[in-house]
Amino acid sequence: MLAPASKARVAHARRLHRRTFRESAGEFLAEGPQAVREAVAAGAVRELFLASADAARHRALADDALAAGARVYDASDAAVTALSGTTTPQGVIAVCARVDVGPEVALGTAPRLVAVLVAVRDPGNAGTIVRTADAAGADAVVFSPESVELANPKCVRASTGSLFHLPIATGVEVAAAVALARLSGMRVFAADGGGDHDLDDELDSGGLAAPTMWLFGNEARGLPTELRALADAVVRVPIHGRAESLNLAAAAAVCLYASARAQRARR
């Protein structure tokens, strides 16, 4: 039998919708069975709220959370609605501890594939890139200071649990990230639609087989000149049809998977 969620615990969790409170508490909300399952596995869950109607269905998840030391509550429909960031709550909401790490942790273990988000402002794009980096086997993701907050609810949802799978460093200056990459012997590529290097050519020539850091710029402005200059090459994704361009998350997926393919072929 789960303890009922008190008004005080619901109020605390609800305040995590505000960035200032997330930062001061060192906590954020994850919602949905998949994301929460990954959070529990990572040991990040502090509190778990289960809708009364769904508690029996998610009993295994509740047991895992309890075994990991989390507090698990039976929550009313009103409480779940208040905590949810969607119009159709899934009935599973967790208060999680911050998961971001310092750049030395994320980049200090000879990584082979890293994605750097440079002033990426759309949380859906950011979360999707985290998910894609995880799927492609990347070793880390880095957020620049100007990028959207990793714990933004839309970013957390878009990552679908992947933010609990790999090291993510936030608030890192791009020049500092590149410097750490150089110490590890990585090549640095800047993704840009106007780049003078073609991704297919880099793939065919073996240029992507080396350990690689990708820089992905702002959705509207791309990468500034001074950051493009830090890269070994500015690379464009070829457009073979009539589309004007790819959106940021799609372009990042193509680039990351091209690197992953080249690196697997070399092994």
Task: Label every PLM stretch briefly.
Residues M1-T87, G185:
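N-terminal positively charged helical leader segments and presequences
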Residues V92, R112-A115, A210-G217:
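Generic beta-sheet signal
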